[in-house]
Amino acid sequence: MQKEKLSALMDGETLDSELLKALTHDPEMQKTWESYHLIRDSMRGDTPDVLHFDISARVMAAIENEPVRQVSPLIPEAQPAPQQWQKMPFWKKVRPWAAQLTQMGVAACVSLAVIVGVQHYNGQSETSQQPETPVFNTLPMMGKASPVSLGVPSEAAPVGSQQQQVQEQRRRINAMLQDYELQRRLHSEQLQFEQAQTQQAAVQVPGIQTLGTQSQ
């Protein structure tokens, strides 16, 4: 009802003293009166280029009226501890087979290296023992024919040094094979010891012992 009276007062249709008195004392009516004038000026095109609006009070009031949201605290859940892959039962079963396959692979690699080394050394020794081809010098010197000369090959290396090199290489190969065999035996003994400890621990479980005594 008051808005209609304010609109009529703004248009000059009525003049109410009580309405003017209320308008001077009521801030809400003053805001409505200002809004009406702004709307009319906008419709007529009488508004300035820059408009100043103070909406801070409305924003603060809207923030205060918003309900407070209560967020429940998050309860951390217990996470399972990561299991090491070495302690998995599947790995305990596969470990002996993997160790044997590894040993076989290492043995094959060592044998291949020995064979290739021996063949390479034999090939080098054969090429070093071949005599040089004779060279015939038939070019004339100072317009005169020179006699044909036959190049004599140099003396071959002594056979004793070559045999010593072969023996030294064989000794090294035998030492490598002996070292590998020793490492393989130590590894197999360690695996057998670990398997025996595992079986002994499985036999000494308290539940199994009590069942055995009750059956007796």
Swiss-Prot record:
Membrane-spanning intervals of the chain: 105-121
Record PTM: Sequentially cleaved by DegS (a site-1 protease) in its periplasmic domain between Val-148 and Ser-149, then by RseP (a site-2 protease) between positions Ala-108 and Cys-109. The N-terminal fragment is then degraded by primarily ClpX-ClpP in an ATP-dependent fashion. Sequential cleavage by DegS, RseP and ClpX-ClpP frees RpoE from RseA.
Localisation per UniProt entry: Cell inner membrane
Keyword Membrane: yes
CC annotations in GO: plasma membrane
Periplasmic topological domain residue ranges: 122-216
Subunit structure and binding partners: Interacts 1:1 with ECF RNA polymerase sigma-E (RpoE); this inhibits the interaction of sigma-E with the RNA polymerase catalytic core and leads to a decreased expression of sigma-E-regulated genes. Interacts with RseB.
Protein name, UniProt field: Anti-sigma-E factor RseA
Native source species: Salmonella typhimurium (strain 14028s / SGSC 2262)
Gene designation: rseA
